[in-house]
């Protein structure tokens, strides 16, 4: 289904930051300024979402691993729901450093988590005391909170989608150091970097409604 300008406006995806907080590098995507708020051109958002959708479809066709990364606490639960719905890997809490540049080490942590999760279903786990079981489950819960969205990830992601480019600046540094990894950056008008035209979505990232609309449009 094609996206219309009305869809963008209804989702409030076109609303940017205050003009004083917006970065000059983003003003080519603006439609103007209203009440001191940078307003993003809905046509630009439509084109960017369509570009992202094509990139995702191409990655799926080649069975590439897709990962969405976000540290926005307000959107953690929704991202988990979307990850399960569309079958993509996700990190929705604290992002481990070196996830791309030191993936083999992180992969071992994921494998360890999966081993721990399997152990809970064994007789050996049942043979533990109630206190030992409780301690073990608490330890597993801490690991799952960070890594459960990537429990099926067996190789370095080949397409990474970043929610809030400015907030995830350190992770974007990792992306720039791993040229074999494709990216889609979803950012607001405060984004301070230049990025490839076919790999960025400049939109409202501070609204549940807007983010839901963007991600569902990308994957549906």
Regions found by a protein language model. Name each.
Residues 77-139:
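Long, charge-dense
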Residues 65-69, 89-92, 161, 182-187:
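Short hydrophobic alpha-helical runs that function as membrane-insertion/retention elements
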Residues 1-65:
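N-terminal, positively charged regions that mediate nucleic acid binding
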Residues 171-220:
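Short glycine/threonine-rich loop/turn motifs
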Residues 63-64, 88, 155-158, 179-182, ...:
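Short glycine-/polar-rich loops that comprise or flank the Walker A/P-loop
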Residues 124-179, 184:
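Extended, charged alpha-helical interaction scaffolds
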Residues 12, 68, 160, 214:
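Residue-level signature of catalytic and energy-coupling elements of molecular machines
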Residues 13, 44, 71-74, 93-100, ...:
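Short, ordered loop/turn segments at secondary-structure junctions
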């Amino acid at each position: 289904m094609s996206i219309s300008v009305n869809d963008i406006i209804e989702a409030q995806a076109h609303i940017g930051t205050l003009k004083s907080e917006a970065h000059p590098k983003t003003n080519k995507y603006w439609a103007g300024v209203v009440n001191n708020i940078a307003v993003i051109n809905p046509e630009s958002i439509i084109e960017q979402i369509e570009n992202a959708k094509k990139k995702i479809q191409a990655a799926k066709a080649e069975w590439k691993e897709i990962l969405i990364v976000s540290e926005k606490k307000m959107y953690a639960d929704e991202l988990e729901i979307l990850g399960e719905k569309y079958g993509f890997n996700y990190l929705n809490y604290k992002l481990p450093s070196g996830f791309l540049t030191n993936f083999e080490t992180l992969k071992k942590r994921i494998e360890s988590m999966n081993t721990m999760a399997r152990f809970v279903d064994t007789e050996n786990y049942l043979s533990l005391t109630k206190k030992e079981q409780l301690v073990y489950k608490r330890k597993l819960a801490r690991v799952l909170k960070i890594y459960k969205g990537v429990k099926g990830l067996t190789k370095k992601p080949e397409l990474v989608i970043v929610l809030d480019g400015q907030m995830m600046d350190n992770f974007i540094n990792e992306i720039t150091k791993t040229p074999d990894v494709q990216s889609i950056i979803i950012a607001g008008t405060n984004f301070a970097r230049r990025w490839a035209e076919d790999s960025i979505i400049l939109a409202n990232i501070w609204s549940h409604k807007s983010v839901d609309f963007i991600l569902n449009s990308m994957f549906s």
